[in-house]
Amino acid sequence: MKKYIVILFISLFGFAQQTPALKQSKTILILGAKAHLGNGQVIQNSLISIKEGKIATIGDATVMKVAKHDITIDASGKHVYPGFIAPNSTLGLVEIDAVRASDDESEIGEFNPHVRSIIAYNAESKLVETTRPNGVLLAQITPRGGRIAGTSSIVQLDAWNWEDAALKTDDGIHLNWPRSYSRAGWWAEPGGIEMNKNYDPQIKEIQAYFDNAFAYLDSKNAKKDIPFEAMKGLQSGEKALYINANGEKEIIDAVLFKKKNKIKKMVIVGGYYAFKAANLLKENEVGVLLKRVHDLPLLEDEDVNLPYKNAKLLVDAGVLVALQNAGDMERMQTRNLPFYAGTCAAWGLTKEQALQLITGNSAKLLGIDNQYGTLESGKSATLFISEGDALDMKTNLISFAFIDGRQISLESHHTELYERYKGKFEQQKK
């Protein structure tokens, strides 16, 4: 009986994986599309030349001329976008929530800066390929759990293995900041809000760990300590410190922690009430990876639309902000990232400002803006062509997608089922 169950399980999840695209060998020219550059600018009638995985030329097709290319794509009436970026993601770390053996998102212990998410990343995850048809082409693979969860890395989403996928390894360390308050009861019967009596001791514990780590790194004779070794780069800026915090007090304390410990680059993850400390964040050059847009308010008595307005409040205050998707069903919902940006556009931002939340701004916060996030000459040709507005689920219809100039497959188990059952109903009409 067990044998048959295993065979059934494999048959359910053993659909063919899409083969990663080969390295670009032919020059490509995209003509006539409305190009959304990811930096707030738009070229109405664009010309984009792609050579050796890079954008060789981009500009106005009405005034520019280029040599003949091996492949020319007529994109008149369509839209071109930079590949969308999914920060703070667990894509490829968990395949099936109910199967413990497929769950690699967290490790035991409280302080795990040495835990590297990249080596657990499954580039052949079925969930990875569902993001590409909606334009999500890059992701920051991030561990969960503990006080210091571990170290994240940034990948492109069309690869054979984690080595091929990696764009920037060990880009930052993720710290879960204590909450200054907690809610009694449970989700069905919530109680009142209570102060966290252990808040100050928990912060002191974090500070002690950082003190010991930096003292170790300054020492020349200390015995090798792998967790402390992983903390190297936080003060020089080689690594960013990502602090998960939503409350105003927690965010203020986190910024003070940054200053005290001379952390060069820090990003707030979540930042639900970051708008209340926006001036402090701007003054200290701290960006925000904003809490999921399609979510409920944290408190019963606050504006029900605050999750939709949050991005505009921060943008208007001059804070560098991008969107992320952590929460329930986060891996499956990664494909909805562009529609979160679309919601932000419906609640105050312009379409181009909203686009920056998942392209240019994300790249800046993750430290990959020298190659990704915007459509510019010399940068990676990681982009896609959509039939319409890619921030609207009705018109996000992608016909071509490229990662580093490689034309990637847009098929997934979902598209296979769509074609299968579309054929069924078409047959019934005849």
Residue ranges and their predicted role:
Residues 127, 134-252, 256-265:
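Polyanionic/metal-chelating signatures
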Residues 1-23:
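Bacterial Sec-dependent N-terminal signal peptides
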